[in-house]
Amino acid sequence: MNTQLDYILTHPGGAHKDDFLACCVLAAKHGVRILRRDPSEGELASPSVAVIDIGGRHEPEFLNFDHHQFPRDHEPICSLSLVLRHLGLYEDARSFCDWLEPAEWFDARGPGETARWLGVERKVINQMVSPMDISLLRRFADEPEHRPGELIWEMMRLIGDDLLTFIQNLRDRLDFIGTHSERWTVEGPQGSFEALFLKRTDPLPGEPSMGMERYVERLGLDGEMTALVYPDRRGSGYGLSRYRDHAGIDLTRVADESDVHFAHARGFVAKTTATDPARLRELLRLAFVGH
């Protein structure tokens, strides 16, 4: 999207997560004001006005991103999805943002069908609503215009920037993990198990463990992996953790080891000063309780 935008236009009335986030992304990329009203024919025909979630048209060449005109049996999709697709980020967003597909379902199918698709009771949808969602959406809906420098616009820019940065950086992060990690097979008295070890680098990433679970998914090893080992960003040693709450690892079993300075009481994470891979494997072996 290299077009110079004059402004972003979305529907008046109640705001929803999809149009809010779509506006956040475009505000972060273009730094322009956001208007909340019905579009004119001239605005729909203008490639310098982004029309979000209103207008009855999906015309990326004119920056029109509405989905309400799609047939009832169309795959669940929302205005945020259409914007991300136009930016070439949709596939990565669907891979990296677990919340995106439920958001598409909620906007296109409503809470009842979304609950059935998720396999939960209808009331669970309401139980997951955050006061942050309520406040941001209400404040966004309250005003007909939001300009750079104003509180809500600046918050939206930050949200959009964080989302874009996360999507764009995670792809690079997965490549980094592929270059600097090793897959371990650890032998223990209860049998063998798999762990992913991320080597320490200089400089160290700000969140060393970020993306490791996604990397395991990408390798197709989700059903095989048991533990993760990664550099401790607060010290010179390593963190050890269960892979997605795998019940085979209980790190309270290594809490009394002399080189372990922290083990969570629930056993899902521990920190050690050890750096020798052989010792790290031994700590995992001691923590393993079986499949």
Region locations from a protein language model:
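C-terminal accessory domains and tails appended to enzymatic cores
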Residues: 4, 13, 17-24, 45-47, ...
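N-terminal ordered "arm"
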Residues: 6-49, 56
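A near-ubiquitous, low-amplitude feature marking generic local secondary-structure context
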Residues: 9, 66-67, 150-153
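Generic marker of "main functional regions" within proteins
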Residues: 18, 27-31, 36, 61-62, ...
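A basic- and aromatic-enriched beta-loop-alpha substructure that forms the phosphate/nucleotide-
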Residues: 49-135
